[in-house]
């Protein structure tokens, strides 16, 4: 990630900057909407005010025109100089209102026509108690022009309302498009800052996954992003180095322990064998019993050491490569390897492989099957049955190892996969259990992207199930 001079160095600064930049377009939109709303409000108030003034003026001009005509006719009937003065006052008032109304009229010709009519009506001309013919014509023309003025005023007022509506619609459309653009800008910034924050978190997640899988992080790990996340990455790298060192120390300790234990154990085994062969002299029955106990204990100790070393070796192994494994040969090999103890206990084994293959590592899977089948033989009931079966369930293959015998107590089921745990039901045979077999088996299955667990099967005493990925050749 390229760092700019103003790039936030901490996660808090980055989050604050993200919030500010994402809110900025929304604040701009809100500010512009407020300004536009104020402008439209002022414009609407102005339109309403001018419309009211113009409408009242046009109404007043209409009334003034009627009063002028009434005063004109009254003067012709009464020939009263006072009425002449009233008429001229009304004419002057109409002229002033016409000048004020000139800006409202859409056509200057109408204004000039009214102005000319007012000029023509400046002198009162009467005949036979009424306006003469020319004056009557001028009064008629003035009334007609005044009516046209009122209609023109109404048209102008209506057009103002329509113009205001069009402007409101245009502003609404403008803000609609602007809102869409600003929303897209905000969305782009959300995605950008999400990537800037999630990217380093994903790197840390990958580092933790590699660490959990037992793979080395190496020295090529690059750290980017806020200082807090870079610090976490550095601590994870330090933790990886520390775990690697502890793992190497553990392996070294186990190698030394194995060497230090196997050497005296071999001498002990050799001594007990010499005593058992009576090389140093004949033994009494009591002495033979003691030698037998020593030999059995030394064998158990050797088996325990070998299982402990095997358990740690499998934990330290790198990730396995899965391949297509045919189940039938593995099962046949495992059953054959334990045929003698099974025959000695008169146990019957059924094999039912409906799923013929799975994805696994052959040696690890054989080791697990060998452990489970060996447990079924040695923990199973005399003259009992053992069943090895497989089935396909979606993208997973189930391999069940079932035997008759004493069921595992409910309170022990959660503990049987823990290292060194031995249940209340003891193993039958010359070699006693160490409590590591099932723990090693589960670790092996999990390294092959599978799972090993105990299930309840109707009509069966004990059933261990292996769950593994199915292969393309699985039927």
From Swiss-Prot:
Domain Histidine kinase per the UniProt entry, residue ranges: 256-472
InterPro entries according to UniProt: HAMP_dom (IPR003660), HATPase_C_sf (IPR036890), His_kinase_dom (IPR005467), HisK_dim/P_dom (IPR003661), HisK_dim/P_sf (IPR036097), Light-responsive_reg (IPR052545), Sig_transdc_His_kin-like_C (IPR004358)
Cited Gene3D superfamilies: 1.10.287.130, Histidine kinase-like ATPase, C-terminal domain (3.30.565.10)
Pfam family, one: HAMP
Transmembrane intervals: 14-34, 174-194
Reported phenotype of the disruption mutant: Mutants show decreased amounts of glmY.
Membrane topology: Multi-pass membrane protein
Glycoprotein keyword on record: no
PANTHER family (UniProt xref): SENSOR HISTIDINE KINASE GLRK (PTHR42878:SF7), TWO-COMPONENT HISTIDINE KINASE (PTHR42878)
Miscellaneous note of the record: Not required for the regulation of the glmY-glmZ-glmS regulatory cascade by glucosamine-6-phosphate depletion.
Protein name as it appears in the record: Sensor histidine kinase GlrK
Species the sequence originates in: Escherichia coli (strain K12)
Originating gene: glrK
